[in-house]
Each structure stands twice: as structure tokens, then as C-alpha cells.
Swiss-Prot record:
<protein>
    <recommendedName>
        <fullName>Zinc finger CCCH domain-containing protein 15 homolog</fullName>
    </recommendedName>
</protein>
<keyword id="KW-0863">Zinc-finger</keyword>
<dbReference type="GO" id="GO:0003729">
    <property type="term" value="F:mRNA binding"/>
</dbReference>
<feature type="compositionally biased region" description="Basic and acidic residues">
    <location>
        <begin position="12"/>
        <end position="28"/>
    </location>
</feature>
<feature type="zinc finger region" description="C3H1-type 2">
    <location>
        <begin position="166"/>
        <end position="203"/>
    </location>
</feature>
<feature type="compositionally biased region" description="Low complexity">
    <location>
        <begin position="1"/>
        <end position="11"/>
    </location>
</feature>
<feature type="coiled-coil region">
    <location>
        <begin position="57"/>
        <end position="82"/>
    </location>
</feature>
<keyword id="KW-0862">Zinc</keyword>
<dbReference type="InterPro" id="IPR032378">
    <property type="entry name" value="ZC3H15/TMA46_C"/>
</dbReference>
<feature type="region of interest" description="Disordered">
    <location>
        <begin position="336"/>
        <end position="382"/>
    </location>
</feature>
<keyword id="KW-0175">Coiled coil</keyword>
<dbReference type="Pfam" id="PF16543">
    <property type="entry name" value="DFRP_C"/>
</dbReference>
<comment type="similarity">
    <text>Belongs to the ZC3H15/TMA46 family.</text>
</comment>
<feature type="compositionally biased region" description="Basic and acidic residues">
    <location>
        <begin position="56"/>
        <end position="70"/>
    </location>
</feature>
<feature type="region of interest" description="Disordered">
    <location>
        <begin position="1"/>
        <end position="70"/>
    </location>
</feature>
<feature type="zinc finger region" description="C3H1-type 1">
    <location>
        <begin position="94"/>
        <end position="121"/>
    </location>
</feature>
<dbReference type="Pfam" id="PF00642">
    <property type="entry name" value="zf-CCCH"/>
</dbReference>
Length: 406
């Protein structure tokens, strides 16, 4: 009987839809934001979800390992074939003081025309000169290998060198300067010459200034490592953030802020009473001593004002806190009272009756106003003169009036 096939996993489309759903949930309401922080957060979430939860540092370590492997392969190939590279000489250096690289490999075909030296004895001078050894302190050879001529030569040189040897342990400033600037080498010569009485060697344990700067430079740490380090330093015994702990923390912070403000105000009042006015604003000065406002009679151009003492009301600045309890809120909830908000079935009939009563009342008031005015005589009317405009037509004909249009 063949073995059972393993259950097929979810398809790629299903996985992609799940990832898109997760991205949409985490970035809800942020896609239309144009801020730089929001866009960076969206890109970070997309990378994390698409990577399937892999830590970004793992990918970085993998790339680093691949790069180191390639460099190791290149070094191995170079050690096998040993290709001769074209020599480059620094500016100001004599090429004859450098041994030809092709000549050492037996590949130089230029002979005497080669600009580099073919003297292999220069190999010893190519070695870096030690900064901790003074070349004038060389020990003499053993006397067992000397002959008479060598002994005489050594005696003469010994007495002559005693006059030229350094007589102090102070280090030469030119030597220190050359070492600090990386100019010290086989071809370096002291400006004081061979007769320089100062030491041309560093004492044991001496640290150069350039090395001190490298040691003082702080080691750089990546953001991911810093976050992981801080998280590990927190430990596991931490308070979980809930509604109750947050409200308690907020209450404590507000009380601390209020106490700090009161203490600061008391300190400023104490300083002001002692005559110290540094750090006190003008408003605080007048609030501490309102008598400063009444500084004399009002002059021309001054504004009138009134002075009064304001009583401090601590109740205005009091803060009340109330903890939210979901169980108490659910018990206090009750059904909404609908009295006065639900329309009755006879509302239309009541409106018609009220309108009829209002119309009847208005008609009665209008009839009462018309009857007294029609029955009462008009005793206050002025008498009318019938002959007032009899001769007015003749007077109008005698007037010479010019037409305004002319």
C-alpha cells in the first residue's frame, strides 16, 4: 500500500492575500498620510510581512558571510598564481631605493634600463624601521671574533662615539613629530644631524596621540543591536500597561506636576520677598505685590484702571479623578425613557382643534376693534375751509416758470 501523501499546504495566492490583509490592518488609515515618518513605518511593515517574520539582521549576516567567502577565494587564487603587480612609487621617492618586483620573480627583461633597483641587499632596508630602538645604541660584536685590526678600529670608534652618544633621556621633538606624521623611516634624518643629543626612540609603553584618538572614538552600534540590547536590559519583571495602571500613572504625574508648580510659585514668592527678582516675570511681580500698579497720580495720556485684590480660589484648580469600572457602568445602564418623545395617535386631531380655537379667538378680537371706531364721532378732526383754493388758478397762470429741460 503506497504511503499517504502529505497534505498540501496553502497556495501562494492564499499566503499573499493573508500578507496583504495583515499589511492593510497594520497600516489602516496611514496610506493617505504624506508624512515622512508614516511612509517609513508603512515601508517597514511591508518589509517585515513580506519577509515572513525574518529578522533583518539575519539577512545582513548572510550577506556578510558571502562577502567574506568571496574575499577568501580571491586570496587563495592570488596565493596560488602569485601575479606580479605593477609597482607604484610615492611622489618624491627615489625608484632606485626600491627593489624591482619583476626582478625578484626573475621576470624583468629591462636590465640596466629598469628604473627600479636590482640590488637584493635593499630588501633589509625595506623593512619598517622600529620606533622603539635608537640605531646609535647598537651593541658591539663579540670580542672572540675580533682580530688586531678590528680591535683597534673598535677602540677608536668607542672613544669617538662616547662624545656623540645621547647624554639625556629626553626624546627629540623632531623625532616625535616625524613619528606622529608617519614620516619616520630608513631615509629620515634628524634636522640636528648625527650630533643630536636627544633620544630617537620611544620609551616602553608610550602611546601616540593618533592611537589615543582611535581608542577614544566610541564604537558604533547599529540600531537593531541597540534595540535588542535595551530590550534585554529591561528584564521580564515589568508592569503590564493596562487601563488601571495607565490611569494611576496619569494621576500620579498630574499630582507631581501640580506639586511642582506650587513649590515653584512658593520659591518665587520667597525670592521676591527677599528682593531677588531674577527669573521672575512682570506678571508674577504684580501678582505677588499688587501695590506696584498704583505708582502715582494719572498723567496726561495715561490709561485709567482700577486696582483690586484677587482672591485665590483653590477649588478652580482642583482636579477630580474617577476610575472607569465597566461592571458598574453596565449595572447603571437602564432602558431609555420615551415619555414626551413618542408621538400620540390623536396628534392630527388635536392640532386641528387647536387651530380652530386660535382662529375663533382672532375673529372675536377683530370685531371688537371695529365696532368702537365706527360708532364714535370724530371730534378731533380739524375744520375744512371751502374757499381756500378759489383764486389759486389765476395766480398759477401769472407765474413765469422756466422749463428745466430747456
Amino acid at each position: 500500500m503506497p504511503p499517504k501523501k502529505a497534505p498540501a499546504g496553502p497556495s501562494k495566492k492564499t499566503e499573499q492575500k493573508k500578507k496583504e490583509k495583515v499589511i492593510e490592518d497594520k497600516t489602516f488609515g496611514l496610506k493617505n498620510k504624506k508624512g515622512n515618518k508614516q511612509q517609513k513605518f508603512i515601508q517597514q511593515v511591508q518589509k517585515q510581512v513580506q519577509a515572513g517574520g525574518h529578522h533583518p539582521r539575519q539577512d545582513g549576516d548572510k550577506k556578510k558571510d558571502e562577502k567574506e567567502k568571496k574575499l577568501a577565494d580571491l586570496r587563495e587564487m592570488a596565493s596560488i598564481f602569485k601575479p606580479v603587480q605593477t609597482q607604484k612609487v610615492d611622489k618624491g621617492t627615489d625608484p632606485k631605493s626600491v627593489v624591482c618586483a619583476f626582478f625578484k620573480q626573475g621576470l624583468c627583461t629591462k636590465g640596466d634600463k629598469c628604473k627600479f633597483s636590482h640590488d637584493l641587499s635593499l630588501e633589509n632596508k625595506v623593512e619598517k624601521r622600529s620606533m622603539y630602538v635608537d640605531m646609535r645604541d647598537n651593541e658591539d660584536d663579540l670580542m672572540t671574533n675580533w682580530d688586531d685590526a678590528k680591535l683597534k678600529e673598535v677602540v677608536d670608534k668607542k672613544h669617538s662615539e662616547e662624545k656623540r652618544r645621547p647624554t639625556t633621556e629626553i626624546i627629540c621633538k623632531f623625532f616625535l613629530e616625524a613619528v606622529e606624521k608617519s614620516k619616520y623611516g630608513w631615509f629620515w634624518e634628524c634636522p640636528n644631524g648625527e650630533k643630536c643629543i636627544y633620544r630617537h626612540a620611544l620609551p616602553p609603553g608610550y602611546v601616540l596621540k593618533r592611537d589615543k584618538k582611535k581608542e577614544d572614538k566610541p564604537t558604533e552600534i547599529s540600531l537593531v543591536d541597540l534595540i535588542e540590547k535595551e530590550r534585554a536590559a529591561l528584564g521580564s519583571n515589568q508592569t503590564r500597561v493596562t487601563l488601571e495602571t495607565f490611569l494611576a500613572w496619569k494621576k500620579r504625574k498630574l499630582q507631581e506636576k501640580k506639586a511642582k508648580m506650587v513649590a515653584e510659585e512658593e520659591r518665587k514668592k520667597s525670592d521676591f520677598s527677599k528682593g531677588k527678582q531674577f527669573g521672575i516675570s512682570g506678571r508674577e511681580m504684580f501678582s505677588f505685590n499688587p501695590d506696584l500698579v498704583d505708582d502715582g497720580p494719572i498723567e496726561e495720556g495715561d490709561a485709567a484702571f482700577d486696582v483690586y485684590k484677587r482672591e485665590d480660589d483653590d477649588d478652580d484648580n482642583a482636579f477630580e479623578f474617577k476610575e472607569l469600572d465597566l461592571a458598574a457602568l453596565s449595572l447603571a445602564a437602564k432602558e431609555v425613557d420615551g415619555s414626551g418623545t413618542i408621538a400620540s395617535s390623536t396628534r392630527l386631531l388635536d392640532q386641528a382643534t387647536e387651530a380652530a380655537k386660535t382662529a375663533a379667538a382672532e375673529d372675536g378680537a377683530a370685531s371688537d376693534d371695529e365696532n368702537p371706531s365706527s360708532s364714535a364721532p370724530a371730534n378731533d378732526a380739524a375744520p375744512f375751509n371751502k374757499d381756500l383754493f378759489v383764486d389759486l388758478a389765476g395766480e398759477l397762470d401769472d407765474l413765469d416758470l422756466d422749463d428745466e429741460d430747456d
